């Protein structure tokens, strides 16, 4: 049983003009809009503007793009794929069977900070683009226009972006050409700016400038979109991203150099304007603002879609509660999560209203994504170890990038009070939610008691044959939460045998296994008692929704076609007309009672878990079951059973 919707993805993976064009529209929106605010942020650090400062800052930008984006992500991370998929959670899925059980912490820290970055990116990119209007008139309402565009971006998510998404690649191609051409044109006014390619100027700046920490914090903004290259690996493929990056990097560097040239030609006024718009000819300013706004929308769209994908993966990895996921288009992988869309919209609006302009947002930007990159570095080190890479290379790689990213982290921490606290607060809340969810699931799983299933074959067969028991359903389906082969959840047996004996023609036990690979969707079926009891194991990839009803229907059709089971109704009037028997699902839901445990920390964790669960959906919907065919049986989750003996007395005495 496998999904058959790979053709569009395979098309995007082919190296060719179309594949490269699609890659430009999907992958490079975030990093491609960095020129809107990086140089402006550098000029606002308070460092004296002179040739050495600008050459040093530009050299830092060029070598950050080279070391961080090109070498770490393009050359190394893109090779660490999970069946073609990339991103920090896909990387973790490859490693979660390692003996180091704490490795999940790296994944949820990285995912939390990456999601926090997804709140600030739409705010700063759209705001900076609209602020270009101030070059035309200082009286234009930047904030209302920005909020209007943000509202439209989030509103259209429910309809999908398939139709306009096809044009993103063409738009971004024009955008990058605009960056490169305008940058190259500006360079001609100050050719000495090309000296910034020499890393010597970066070293001089970092060793001599008293404001080097602040400058590095601003420089880091040029590579914040690097993580997207890795996260979008599954959409476009390694070769398309690698080849496209050569073009994108060249255009970005030309634009940064062009902005630097303009600054050195206008040292007195440079800090009061945005150099990005200043290098544009006056006749092209409106066009540049429109293009910048469009690029900001593309970048925002990529971040929103990326957030949906990350949380979808987190659900199957048991990092996040199940939520209602919609598929607004037929494009594979395009998701829409209504609750998250609303939460992101509120978050972005609050960021815009709180910081008011892009200069203040720059202080909030960069800190969270630095932590994500550091977590990716650590996970990559473990991955390289599993691939048998020489230990000396792993130590050099991890040591070098832990130092580089550690310095960037320290530099960005200098902006904590000015705004960095905001994304760290968001990331901290998300981390707490994931941490609680992971541990609560472990607690629930730990206290599920199981029994050997084969001990109950006979009694289940006897119940089926006992016509004095009213027939509950023709086909009775349970999801078995026992994670041991040959075992069954004892509450499941209690439901069939003790609570209300349930007679059925066939009993089906569904075992769900979430695979470490992204697109796995397969099953195996074992007949435990002929014509009575069946066990179906479904293996589901971490990017696939567990739509159990749909998959079971396909499984049953396969079994009927191969004549391994006869599902025609046992009622004579229905059987002679070939009508199949009905299906009924029973879900065993364990309810945690704090008074069953003396562990206060555990009680607090489970209480928070219950609160977090309210933002999700119930188990029948989470498993994609037809709720009209589902019965939920609630049972207590017993942690520590306190059995107190009751004393027998001869006669009750009256109370005085």
Feature locations, PLM:
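The structured alpha-helical core of multi-pass membrane proteins
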Residues: 2-656
């Amino acid at each position: 049983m496998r999904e058959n919707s790979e053709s569009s993805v395979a098309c995007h993976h082919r190296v060719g003009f179309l594949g490269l064009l699609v890659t430009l529209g999907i992958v490079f929106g975030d990093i491609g809009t960095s020129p809107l605010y990086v140089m402006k942020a550098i000029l606002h650090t308070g460092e004296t503007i002179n040739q050495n400062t600008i050459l040093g800052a530009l050299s830092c930008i060029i070598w950050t793009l080279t070391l961080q984006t090109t070498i770490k992500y393009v050359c190394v991370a893109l090779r660490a794929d999970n069946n073609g998929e990339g991103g920090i959670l896909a990387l973790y899925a490859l490693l979660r069977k390692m003996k180091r059980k704490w490795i999940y912490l790296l994944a949820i820290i990285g995912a939390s900070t990456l999601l926090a970055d997804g709140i600030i990116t739409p705010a700063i990119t759209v705001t900076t683009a609209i602020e270009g209007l101030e070059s035309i008139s200082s009286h234009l309402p930047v904030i209302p226009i920005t909020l209007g565009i943000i509202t439209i971006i989030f509103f259209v998510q429910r309809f999908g972006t398939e139709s306009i998404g096809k044009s993103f690649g063409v738009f971004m191609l024009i955008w990058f050409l605009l960056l490169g051409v305008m940058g190259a044109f500006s360079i001609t006014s100050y050719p000495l700016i090309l000296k910034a390619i020499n890393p010597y100027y970066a070293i001089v700046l970092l060793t001599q400038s008293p404001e080097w920490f602040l400058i590095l914090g601003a420089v880091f903004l040029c590579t914040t979109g690097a993580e997207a290259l890795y996260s979008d690996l599954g959409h476009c493929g390694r070769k398309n991203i690698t080849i496209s990056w050569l073009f994108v990097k060249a255009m970005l560097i030309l634009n940064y150099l062009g902005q630097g040239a303009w600054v050195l030609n206008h040292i007195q006024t440079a800090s009061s304007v945005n150099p990005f718009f200043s290098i544009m000819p006056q006749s092209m300013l409106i066009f540049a603002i429109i293009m910048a706004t469009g690029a900001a929308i593309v970048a925002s769209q990529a971040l929103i879609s990326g957030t949906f994908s990350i949380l979808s993966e987190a659900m199957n990895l048991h990092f996040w509660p199940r939520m209602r996921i919609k598929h607004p288009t037929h494009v594979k992988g395009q998701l829409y999560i209504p609750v998250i869309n609303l939460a992101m919209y509120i978050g972005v609006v609050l960021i815009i209203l709180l910081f008011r302009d892009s200069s203040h947002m720059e202080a909030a930007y960069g800190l969270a994504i630095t932590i994500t990159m550091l977590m990716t570095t650590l996970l990559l080190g473990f991955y390289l170890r599993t691939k048998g890479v020489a230990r000396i290379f792993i130590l050099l790689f991890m040591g070098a990038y832990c130092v580089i990213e550690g310095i960037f982290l320290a530099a960005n921490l200098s902006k904590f009070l000015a705004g960095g606290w905001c994304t760290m607060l968001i990331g901290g809340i998300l981390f707490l939610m994931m941490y609680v969810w992971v541990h609560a699931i472990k607690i629930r799983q730990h206290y599920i008691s199981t029994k050997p299933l084969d001990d109950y074959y006979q009694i289940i067969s006897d119940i089926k044959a006992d016509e004095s028991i009213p027939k509950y359903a023709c086909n009775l389906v349970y999801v078995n939460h026992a994670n041991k082969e040959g075992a069954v959840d004892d509450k499941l047996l209690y439901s069939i045998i003790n609570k209300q004996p349930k007679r059925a023609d066939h009993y089906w036990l569904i075992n769900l296994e979430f695979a470490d690979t992204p697109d796995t969707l397969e099953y195996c079926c074992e007949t435990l008692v002929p014509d009575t009891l069946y066990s179906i194991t479904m293996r589901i990839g971490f990017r696939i929704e567990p739509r159990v009803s749909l998959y079971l229907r396909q499984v049953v059709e396969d079994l009927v076609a191969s004549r391994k089971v006869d599902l025609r109704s046992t009622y004579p009037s229905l059987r002679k007309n070939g009508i199949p028997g009905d299906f009924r699902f029973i879900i065993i839901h364990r309810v945690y009672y704090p008074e069953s445990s003396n562990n206060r920390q555990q009680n607090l964790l489970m209480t928070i878990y219950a609160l977090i669960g309210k933002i999700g959906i119930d188990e029948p919907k989470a498993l994609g079951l037809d709720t009209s065919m589902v019965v939920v049986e609630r049972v207590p989750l017993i942690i520590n059973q306190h059995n107190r003996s009751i004393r027998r007395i001869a006669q009750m005495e009256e109370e005085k």
